[in-house]
Amino acid sequence: MANVVVIGAQWGDEGKGKITDLLSRSADVVVRYQGGVNAGHTIVVDEKVLKLHLIPSGILYPETICLIGSGTVVDPKVMLKEIKMLKDNDIDISGLQLASTAHVTMPYHCVIDAAMEERRGLKKIGTTGRGIGPTYADKSQRNGIRVIDLLDERKLREALEIPLAEKNELLEKIYGKEAIDKEKIIEEYLEFGRLIKPHVVDCTRIIHKASRNKKNILFEGAQGTLLDLDHGTYPFVTSSNPVSGGACIGAGVGPTLIDRVIGVAKAYTTRVGEGPFPTELKGKINDQLCDRGGEYGTTTGRRRRCGWFDGVIGKYAVEVNGLDCLAITKLDVLDELEEIKVCTSYELNGEKIDYFPSSAEDFGKCTPIFKTLPGWKSSTANCRHLEDLPPPAMAYLRFLAELMEVPIAIVSLGASRDQTIVVEDPIHGPKRALLSS
């Protein structure tokens, strides 16, 4: 038995969906532990492209239990659309389960999210506009609506009474928007409750039962370390905790239940939205990475900002998450480059530093110090073993492993499942990897 957490080691969009899908074949339970529909992952199966925002990647394996945990925020409209899409593609969803205690994103959350971002003007954060922040804010203020409330009209009416009155006053008097009709919401969300009721469970109880029965449990994070509310580039962050510690809170397990933490990182770096990004590229190479990597957000469709691999934030992610190993994705995107740069440290106010500054203002002033490595100018897309890789590609991976001081267990060379080199099975293999320092 092994219980594994999969986290993003950068700013999200690292390819966690593919890695989780790969590991899910060995998992009995897959748990999404935080975030909402602001996250998106793309999975390619039999040339079909499936884009999911809420439902865990493990849903593609019919024997796997897929839990949407208590730490998530759920938009039932999106969940039902994803259920329909999966059914239309003949995918068995009988293993899909939703925590009764997860909070629900309501229509007013989305309206307020967009209005707040509009009001910020030039100081905007770059939110997806999906209502995630306002949903988590209501949760913290104990004004939230939970999944269990959608199953009982009396509970839903009581739960809506105070927050909806407050939100309507805010919408009308501060943002100049129309008030939201209470009866319409109640009717609509009771129907959502009726439709999702077969999937609603006590999430924590199921996880602990699986643990007692020595099952393999995979905890799937959304977004990435540098978007963590407490440990990211605040305020340009998400409203939850994507780091490995968030798995304990969002799934309701103790840290001793976690056996291993896998960090997923691209062979370069991307970021969506606002906020500092020291290794960001402009011009031809940026366009090349964006086009070859298909760097457009699954959730927003926004073009991602691209840059060289940043080893400083990488080492920070190793420390914050307690990473045991890495999965490096999109190595093939670098195939046509003459040379490749890796940030090994920063210069801040004339001083060389090798750590991630806690101030976003200081981080924005950091100038990257690069190590230049030769490119390989040949395709890696069909490589299936380490020895198939061009020597410069192997050298690049070894350099990343040495810089991050953590072994590489998986290398992804494309979107398809078979475009993967598994150096070590992170669930069943020994706690080591062959490609290491």
UniProtKB/Swiss-Prot annotation:
Q: Gene3D superfamilies this protein is in?
A: Adenylosuccinate Synthetase, subunit A, domain 1, Adenylosuccinate Synthetase, subunit A, domain 2, Adenylosuccinate Synthetase, subunit A, domain 3
- EC number(s) in its UniProt entry? 6.3.4.4
* Active site per database record: 13, 41
Q: Which GO terms describe its biological process?
A: 'de novo' AMP biosynthetic process; IMP metabolic process
Q: Which InterPro entries match?
A: Adenylosuccin_syn_GTP-bd (IPR018220), Adenylosuccin_syn_Lys_AS (IPR033128), Adenylosuccinate_synth_dom1 (IPR042109), Adenylosuccinate_synth_dom2 (IPR042110), Adenylosuccinate_synth_dom3 (IPR042111), Adenylosuccinate_synthetase (IPR001114), P-loop_NTPase (IPR027417)
**EC class:** ligase
Provide the binding site for IMP.
13-16, 38-41, 128, 142, 223, 238, 302
Q: Which GO terms describe its cellular component?
A: cytoplasm
In the record's cofactor note, how is the cofactor described as bound? Answer: Binds 1 Mg(2+) ion per subunit.
Q: Which domain of life is it from?
A: Bacteria
Major localization class: cytoplasm
Reaction catalysed by this chain? IMP + L-aspartate + GTP = N(6)-(1,2-dicarboxyethyl)-AMP + GDP + phosphate + 2 H(+)
Q: Where does substrate bind?
A: 298-304
What functional role does this protein have? Answer: Plays an important role in the de novo pathway of purine nucleotide biosynthesis. Catalyzes the first committed step in the biosynthesis of AMP from IMP.
Name the UniProt record assigns to this protein: Adenylosuccinate synthetase
Q: Which organism is it from?
A: Prochlorococcus marinus (strain SARG / CCMP1375 / SS120)
